[in-house]
């Protein structure tokens, strides 16, 4: 099984969730073993997608350094993971990725347009060898060894509309596109004023966010899935784990997880060299793992 990049460059435009300004995005092919690289064209600054370059996880996953930052990368990273793309350059002319419709389906469409290209190098994956867990009170995220990677996610909100939701996701591109990619980000009406006073969520609207009041959803079209909230959390988690630099072959289990806990989990994994193994998918080893990339 070979590493993948894009067959051609594709461009798109969307609104930034937090600043509310138009953003141009370009996805470009990269050579083997380059990984996922973000480039701020307005700053002439590159940022490798990796846990060590994460500087904030409050409202989104943010890469950066003293030159600047790039926010809200998780939806795009999630789509890149689902398509099995190992090497890609993401060019942005602003400090965040566009929110599109609040899900990752627009990025999936861009990747469909770009198509994928095999490179002359074996694909590598990260195989989890022993359990790794991060906790914050009763909230936790955990990676454990497995023969068939799954995500088991539970959320619990003190809100009648959301309440407690659980979802089990088994990795495959087809499953992702059908059941995860269209799940939108969500927020609460009561938080909007406070966020905007901090210059956040200025681009948020019913076009790109599920807005929840105390006992109703304000979006006139309603939900895309009855459990869209937990499905979006899975979308986010896939994007956050992609910062490890490889498709992760392990069970991810979360109760009330977050970008912050996901970030701590990726750091915890990398801290313990016995917790994982990087496996090169040569012909002799790929059969056990190829289902994940179907």
Curated annotation (Swiss-Prot):
Span of the signal peptide: none
For activity, the cofactor(s) needed are: Zn(2+)
What's in the keyword line of the UniProt record? Hydrolase, Lipid A biosynthesis, Lipid biosynthesis, Lipid metabolism, Metal-binding, Zinc
Provide a GO CC annotation, any one: membrane
- Name the positions where Zn(2+) binds: 75, 232, 236
Record has Hydrolase as a keyword: yes
Q: What is its EC number?
A: 3.5.1.108
**Catalytic activity reported:** a UDP-3-O-[(3R)-3-hydroxyacyl]-N-acetyl-alpha-D-glucosamine + H2O = a UDP-3-O-[(3R)-3-hydroxyacyl]-alpha-D-glucosamine + acetate
Q: Tell me which Gene Ontology terms the entry assigns under biological process.
A: lipid A biosynthetic process
| Pathway info | Glycolipid biosynthesis; lipid IV(A) biosynthesis; lipid IV(A) from (3R)-3-hydroxytetradecanoyl-[acyl-carrier-protein] and UDP-N-acetyl-alpha-D-glucosamine: step 2/6
Positions of the catalytic residues? 259
Enumerate the Pfam families for this protein.
LpxC
The record's listing under Gene3D superfamilies reads: lpxc deacetylase, domain 1, lpxc deacetylase, domain 2
Family matches, as NCBIfam families: lpxC (TIGR00325)
By sequence similarity, the record places it as follows: Belongs to the LpxC family.
Name under which the protein is recorded:
UDP-3-O-acyl-N-acetylglucosamine deacetylase
